[in-house]
Structure formats: C-alpha cells, structure tokens
Amino acid sequence: MPRYKLVVEYDGTAFAGWQRQAADRTVQQALEEAIERFVNRPVRVHCAGRTDAGVHASHQVVHLDLDREWRTDTVRDATNAHLRPEPVSVLSAARVGPDFDARHSALKRHYRYRILNRRSPPALARGYVWHVPWALDAAAMHAAAQTLLGRHDFSAFRAAECQASSPLRTLDQLDVERRGDEILVATSARSFLHHQVRGMVGTLMLAGSGRLDTAGVRAVLDSRDRARCGPLAPAAGLTLTGVDYPEAALSAPG
C-alpha cells in the first residue's frame, strides 16, 4: 500500500486534542473523515506529535497508507475540500517509503509559545496567547531557561497522567525573546513529556516576574517534584511549528 506524508496546520481551539475520542471532536477524527470521503474506504492517520486540547499546529506531520496511487496534489486538494469548514488544512502531500513513520522517524520537534505581556487583554489574539498583564523580564526568563538545556529528568514538568516510560529527555533549545508586547518561547527536542513545554513556560513566567531566580528554576528541575513547578501555561499559547526528519526517511519510493 502506498504511503503518504502530509503536512497539516490547524486551529486547536475547537478540538479536544489530536487523538480520537469517543465523544469529543478531535483533529485526527476530522482529518480521517475527510480523507475517507474521497478514497471511499477507512483510513487511519498517524501523527508526529499528539497535541492537547486547545493546542495549535502550523506544521504537524502525519503519515497514512492508501490502497492505490494518487497524485499528491489530489490527496492535498481533495482532503482540503472535504475538510471544510473545519479549521484544518493540508499544506502538502508527498509519497514516502513504507518505512517512514511520522512519529518514530522524527529527529526533532519544534514548539513556540506566545505570551501577550501588556495590561490590556487580547481582542485579535484571543485563543492564541497567554495574557499576562504584569511586567515580565524576558532576559531573566531566557537566562533561567538555559539551565534546563541538556539531558535531564523532567519529572517536575511532567503531567501526572503522562504515560512515557521514562522522564529523561534531552532539551536542545529553550529561547525566550521579547517582540513588542509579546514574549516568544521557542523550544526543540527529539520528544517532550506530556505538559513539559507548558510546565516549563509557567515556571519561566515566575522567573520573569521575579518570583524565581535562575538558581530557583534549576532547583525546580532538580527536585523532580511536580508540586514545585510553576502554573501550567494555558494550551492556547502553544503551537507545534515543525518536525525534522533525516533526508533518507523522506525519499520517495523507487
């Protein structure tokens, strides 16, 4: 069966996350139903990162197997036609070999978190930022973030319901910068624990507020205690922005 790789973007506001659920609408369900309507057979899609309810994606990667060859532009355009009016869009489709796996072939995942740091609440960006109305020091947040880089036990930032077999992760990037009224947090790793990014952002917010210094943020990490973590940053500010793969994994078959 030919395998296809799709790059997908979506607004997570209306969805109960990526993964199919019995009652609530999810991104996986919307995408599978759209593809099934044009290929006229059951389809299962597999993603690079299972985003939570309210989390967005500008570059989610999925793979799926179809029972015949289709032009890649047909896969993209027909899926988008059947997705309307869902806030989901297939940006590209490509043929890949049978060994490509959107999740297991990934080398690195990239996320961005947006904090709106001003007194006035958002009107246009509501649903896409965390509004923090008190002053934050982005430079202090960035300095504290650097203490989290490398391979560590990230249990302090892990959700209680996280199903990962190990809390060890290698954090490759955690940068914080201010752009006008917004503070942007960019982070990259091969994989993250459930709620890890949002837990780190909430803790860095405390550093920006002056409630934790750099050593205090590192102490949270070293404690391995979820109770020491800052508040869980809201899902709305988080976007999956990219997934990296080795070139060999992206090669077209034949």
From Swiss-Prot:
One of its GO terms (biological process) is tRNA pseudouridine synthesis. This is tRNA pseudouridine synthase A. It comes from the Bacteria. Substrate binds at residue 111. Pfam families: PseudoU_synth_1. Homodimer. The gene is truA. HAMAP family: TruA. Disulfide bonds: none annotated. Keywords: Isomerase, tRNA processing. It catalyses: uridine(38/39/40) in tRNA = pseudouridine(38/39/40) in tRNA. Belongs to the tRNA pseudouridine synthase TruA family.
